[in-house]
């Protein structure tokens, strides 16, 4: 069996890299004889990291390019998309493999695959509306050419526009198997497709299966002594598009200011070492820059000299090992939160989408969670003060809860057998 893992993006998005790593591990565990290929924006990196065949993403998005280049890219993309769609309707799978059709190179890897597994995780929602159409097109094209399509645990929704909801309903109804990673996504998807559908199953984000490096190695990377009390912070630049609520804090300037004030106060009151953990680095085709945000927060602090920023891109295993060294982590990125809680570290989350809040709720940590539009240093300090004396209890609680979720992920993989037949 040939398995294509697609929508893998870049290793410089550490969450995306963790999804690829653990998708490979889960699929190899269940289908050891299968050939696995990864489709990613930077395929060479995944080839080197995991020893798998890797190919370029079918959509080479023109991120951060001038507008005229983006327009040209869009015209070309629409041309090959239409051509491949028509060809897939005129020819069956075997004939497509042998017939010369325009732009066949674009679908060569889809024709190779018996099973195509998306690890995009959060592309089917209107907060990332620039991607949703291309992702839904890919799922529909896979079905049209006769490949079986599976969406690995993902956030589905929110849908802010009627057209996107209707399009998602139409396309997702043809996907062979959909895993959601939170209860809200499960409810939304079943609402789209109907409550009785057997193609939708709820489980947890597969990054919870991530392995981690040991404590000594992690402390060496951080540059910290074993007896130091570390508090980790993961920050990001958020667009504040269609805010759930408007407050004095629902903007990026306020987010940076409040995070800097929080870090300064924690150093003054608790004598902790603050370590900033970016999870998106502006290399290897990654368009997000959490490193820049971390440096900006540090520059706004009065105690910035006491802050360490992890400036070199780590692997998911290294990041998780470093997060495990913290007494408490304050996270914004989804996968920083998942890797932190997965490492058993007591975690306070700032939720930029409901998926983060849902993850915290599923672990019994909702009281330590706030939406990004409302995040402020006073709330964060009060929450930190509640968690600090109870942190060892929460660490033990997390270890039990994560083990249960890991068992649930492994059990949910049984549904693949009905598709990968």
Show where each model-derived region lies:
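Active-site anion-handling motifs in enzyme catalytic cores
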Residues: 1-421
């Amino acid at each position: 069996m040939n398995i294509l893992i697609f929508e893998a993006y870049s290793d410089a998005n550490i969450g995306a890299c963790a999804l690829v790593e653990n998708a490979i591990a889960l699929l190899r565990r269940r289908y050891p004889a299968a050939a696995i290929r990864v489709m990613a924006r930077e395929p060479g990196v995944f080839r080197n990291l995991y020893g798998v065949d890797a190919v370029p993403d079918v959509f080479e998005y023109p991120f951060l390019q001038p507008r005229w280049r983006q327009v040209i890219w869009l015209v070309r993309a629409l041309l090959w998309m239409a051509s491949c769609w028509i060809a897939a309707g005129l020819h069956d799978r075997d004939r497509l493999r042998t017939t010369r059709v325009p732009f066949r190179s674009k679908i060569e890897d889809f024709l190779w695959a018996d099973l195509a597994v998306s690890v995009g995780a959060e592309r089917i929602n209107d907060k990332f509306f620039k991607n949703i159409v291309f992702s839904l097109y890919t799922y529909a094209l896979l079905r049209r050419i006769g490949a079986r399509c599976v969406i690995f645990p993902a956030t589905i929704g929110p849908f802010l526009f009627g057209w996107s909801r209707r399009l998602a309903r139409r396309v997702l109804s043809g996907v062979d198997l959909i895993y959601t990673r939170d209860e809200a996504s499960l409810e939304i998807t079943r609402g789209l497709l109907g409550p009785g559908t057997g193609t939708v199953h709820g489980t947890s984000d597969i990054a919870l299966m991530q392995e981690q490096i040991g404590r000594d190695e992690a402390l060496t990377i951080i540059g910290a002594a074993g007896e130091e009390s570390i508090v980790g912070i993961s920050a990001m630049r958020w667009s504040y598009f269609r805010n759930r609520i408007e407050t004095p804090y629902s903007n990026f300037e306020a987010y940076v200011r409040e995070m800097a004030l929080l870090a300064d106060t924690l150093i003054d009151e608790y004598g902790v070492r603050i370590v900033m953990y970016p999870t998106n680095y502006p290399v290897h085709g990654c368009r997000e820059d959490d490193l820049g945000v971390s440096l900006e927060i540090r520059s706004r602090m009065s105690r910035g000299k006491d802050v360490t920023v992890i400036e070199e891109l780590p692997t998911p295993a290294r990041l998780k090992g470093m997060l495990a060294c913290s007494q408490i982590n304050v996270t914004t990125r989804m996968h920083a939160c998942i890797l932190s809680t997965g490492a058993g570290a007591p975690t306070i989350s700032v939720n930029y989408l409901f998926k983060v809040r849902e993850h915290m709720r599923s672990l019994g940590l909702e009281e330590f969670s706030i939406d990004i539009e409302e995040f402020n240093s006073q709330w964060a300090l009060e929450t930190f003060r509640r968690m600090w004396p109870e942190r060892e209890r929460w660490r033990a609680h997390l270890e039990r809860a994560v083990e249960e979720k890991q068992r649930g992920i492994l059990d949910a993989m049984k549904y693949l057998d009905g598709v990968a037949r």
